[in-house]
Regions:
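Arginine/glycine-rich "motif VI" loop of SF2 helicases in the C-terminal RecA-like domain
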Residues: 64-68, 127, 163-170
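Short beta-strand-loop
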Residues: 72-102, 119-127, 151-152, 183-193, ...
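Negatively charged sequence features
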Residues: 1-39
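Short glycine/serine/threonine/alanine-rich loop segments
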Residues: 71, 170, 196
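VWA/integrin I-like adhesion module and closely mimicked acidic/polar interface patches used
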Residues: 143-193
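Catalytic core regions of nucleotide second-messenger enzymes
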Residues: 130-132
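Von Willebrand factor
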Residues: 29-89, 105, 111-117, 121, ...
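Short acidic-hydrophobic, aromatic-tinged amphipathic segments that line or gate anion-handling sites
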Residues: 197-204
Length: 225
C-alpha cells in the first residue's frame, strides 16, 4: 500500500516512507503482533541522554498502538560494567511508564555484556514460542570500553558476541550514533557480524527510530505494506 504513494511524501530517512494507514498485518501478526527489543548504549559517550530519551519515546508510541497492533516491546541498557533489563517484554504502556521513569546514564561501555543480555532474553522468548521472530534494535557508536575479563579486548569481545547473535538470522537493525570527527566505523562492523541492517544517524529521534523498527520488520515480511 505504501509503495505506490511514495511520490510527494517527505522522506524521514527510510527506504520506504511508512505511515500508520499503510500498515496491514499478515494473518499471524494480526493474532500475535511483533516483538521489538531495544538494546541501548547508556554509557558516558556523547548523546547518551538523547538516545535514552528517544528510545523511551518510541517505546511509548509503540505501546500506545498495542491494542490494535498487539506489538510488544522491551528495553535493555548497558553502562559501566553491566547490562540491565530496564523493561521486560510487555504490551502495557502503564508498566513501561513505571519501569522507565528513571533512565541512568554514564560510565564505561560494556557492549559485549549488552549483547549477551540481549541473547539471554531472546533465548527465553524462543523457548516460549519457537515461531517468534523478534526484531532487535541496537543503538550504539560501537566503541566498547569494558571487556568481559581482564585479559580480553572489549571491541573483540563485542564483535565475537555480535557474530553469535548473527547466527540466529533474525531481523536486526544497528543504529550508529558515532559523531566524533575521527570515525572508527565499529558499529558498521558490528552490523556486518550480525547480518543486520545498518543505519547511521547524526541526530536520533523518536520518528527515526520508529521508522527503522518498522522497516526492519517489513524487510523480513513481518509488516505487509
Amino acid at each position: 500500500a505504501a509503495a505506490p504513494h511514495q511520490k510527494g511524501r517527505q522522506s524521514n530517512g527510510c527506504a520506504v516512507v511508512i505511515r500508520h494507514e499503510d500498515i496491514r498485518r499478515k494473518e499471524r501478526e494480526k493474532r500475535t503482533g511483533n516483538i521489538f527489543l531495544f538494546l541501548v548504549d547508556a554509557s558516558g559517550s556523547m548523546g547518551a541522554r538523547e538516545r535514552m530519551k528517544a528510545v523511551k519515546g518510541v517505546v511509548f508510541k509503540m505501546l500506545a498502538d498495542a491494542y490494535q497492533k498487539r506489538d510488544r516491546v522491551g528495553m535493555i541498557a548497558f553502562r559501566r560494567d553491566r547490562a540491565e533489563v530496564l523493561l521486560p517484554i510487555t504490551r502495557s504502556i502503564e508498566f513501561a511508564q513505571k519501569k522507565l521513569a528513571a533512565l541512568p546514564t554514564g560510565g564505561k561501555t560494556p557492549l559485549a555484556q549488552g549483547l549477551i543480555k540481549a541473547e539471554d532474553m531472546l533465548d527465553r522468548l524462543y523457548r516460549q514460542d519457537p515461531l517468534q521472530d523478534p526484531v532487535l534494535i541496537l543503538i550504539t557508536d560501537g566503541r566498547a570500553t569494558n571487556s568481559l575479563n581482564k585479559n580480553t579486548d572489549p571491541v573483540r569481545d563485542a564483535l565475537s558476541e555480535a557474530e553469535r547473535i548473527g547466527h540466529r538470522h533474525m531481523p536486526i537493525a544497528v543504529i550508529d550514533t558515532e559523531s566524533s570527527f575521527i570515525k572508527l566505523g565499529l558499529a558498521k562492523e558490528l552490523a556486518q557480524k550480525m547480518g543486520a541492517s545498518y543505519f547511521h544517524v547524526d541526530k536520533i529521534s523518536e520518528d527515526r527510530l520508529l521508522c527503522i523498527g518498522r522497516q526492519t520488520a517489513y524487510e523480513r515480511g513481518q509488516y505487509d505494506l
